[in-house]
Amino acid sequence: GGPTDIAVLSLGGKVKATSVRVAGNHYDEEILKFVRNKYSVAIGQRTAEELKKNVACCPQKTDFHETMEIKGRSLLTGLPVRVNVSTDDLYEPVMMLSEQIGTAAHQVLEKTPPELAGDIFRNGVMLTGGGAQLHGLTEYLSEELKVEVTVSPDPVNCVALGTAMSLGLNDKLETGFLDATPRIGRR
C-alpha cells in the first residue's frame, strides 16, 4: 500500500487534500515489529496481515476482543513456536498509525472553507481502500472528527471503479471486460 490520501471534494473537484505515509502495509510492519519485540518471535508478512484483519482494532470498539494463535520462529531458540496474540496486545501499534490518519483528516477539515461544513455534516466522511476494513477505524475517526464516518460498500475496489467511471468506461465495467491494449501511436 501507498499513502493514505485524505480529501474534501466538492462539485467534482478537490477543495483540500493531504497524504500521510500510513497504509495497510504499515500496520502489518508495526504488528510484525510488535510480535518480534514482545514475544521474541519472527513472523511473516502474511501472519501480520491476518492479525490485522482478524484481531487488530482501534480502541473505541470495546465489544471487539479477539485472540489468534500464530506460529513463528523463536528468536531465542530458533525453533518453531506458537503464541496467542489478542486485540489488547495490538492496541499500541494500531493506534499509533490510526492517530496519524485521524490527525491528518482533522487538519484537512480545519482548512476546509466554512461554507462546506453543512455538506460535511450532512454527507459525513467516506473511507475507502483496504485500510478502511480495520475493526473500529470508522468509530475512532467519527469520534475524532465529530462527523459520521462510513466505509464504502466496496472499499478495496472503489478507487479503481471511480477512476474507470470518471474516464467514461462505465459500460466496460458492467461487462467485466476492458480492452487494455496499448494505444501508443494510434489516433
Q: Over which residues does each language-model region extend?
A:
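A short acidic Gly-Thr/Ser loop motif
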Residues: 1-3, 9-13, 23-25, 31, ...
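Phosphate-binding glycine-rich/basic clefts of nucleotide- and phosphate-handling proteins
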Residues: 9-95
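Short, surface-exposed connector motifs at secondary-structure boundaries
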Residues: 13-15, 117-123, 145-148
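Phosphate/ATP-binding catalytic cores across multiple sugar-kinase/actin-like superfamilies
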Residues: 93-121, 166-169
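Glycine-rich phosphate-binding loops at beta-strand->alpha-helix junctions
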Residues: 117-141
